[in-house]
Amino acid sequence: MEKHLLVAVGDEYASSLSLRYVYGFFSRRDDVKLTLFYVSPKTPSHAAAATGQGQDPPRCRVGDAAALPALEKAKSWLLDMGFPKANVFTKTCRSDQGVVKDIIKECEAGLYDAAVLGRRGLSWFDEMFTDSVSHKILWEAVGFPIWVCRNPDQNRKDVLVCLDGSPQCLRVADHAGFILAGEPAHDITLLNIRAEDSADPGPVFAKAKEILAENGVAPGRVRTRTVTSPNPSQAILKLAKTENYAAVAIGRTGDRPQALMEHIVGSTSLKLLRKLEGAALWLCK
């Protein structure tokens, strides 16, 4: 089944990390649609329009690659790398609510299968952890997967899907299955980090395998692994590095905004977000 990803593009070189990751990850590029999305800052004319002093131009435009060197350069690079021209789209949007909120708004409106952010995307995430309102937007209102790419290594393979039995982690398995069903370059490892007295992870693995099979992933492409550790994030980071995984997929929670800071600080997903390099972090709620 065809996948459609939103790839955030910025002016600086670092934003190319998301492009490099997408190129390196997919071997069947005919099955992937990419929308390159650029959020431009507000200009004086936009501000005047917002206050009724001018005509408000369209907030988002499709196909404006020629108007923005960053978009045109990104699109040309992807075409040179083998992505079909018919599968690569460009879209510009003047900032309305701030870059992060504008990306969220576009992803929800466009029904993308994931949003892909590079290093600049990581800095946007860091900003979100300093503001309670932004916390709420990221950890509650975002209903689509987010891929964060920090120094991606194109020689890495396979996806490490972290499971703890929560609904969020089962949705991670569903997302990984959808992305990888028609992508033979990568297999899946289901990982359970457990304490000494934890319950048998067998039922969790069985449910995840069932979800993967429903997505069309052959059983032979799925492995399971159990690690006993009191520090889940450290164990995941070590495994991702030693086994050279291309992606680490993990669920994220945030169902109670009043307890958000207590939940997020020190969470496994936050530690991975800040420390994982070489592999992309796939976050699903």
Q: Where are the regions that the model predicts?
A:
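A short acidic, glycine-rich active-site loop
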Residues: 55-69
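A conditional alpha-helix N-cap/helix-loop micro-motif detector
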Residues: 15, 96, 169, 229-230, ...
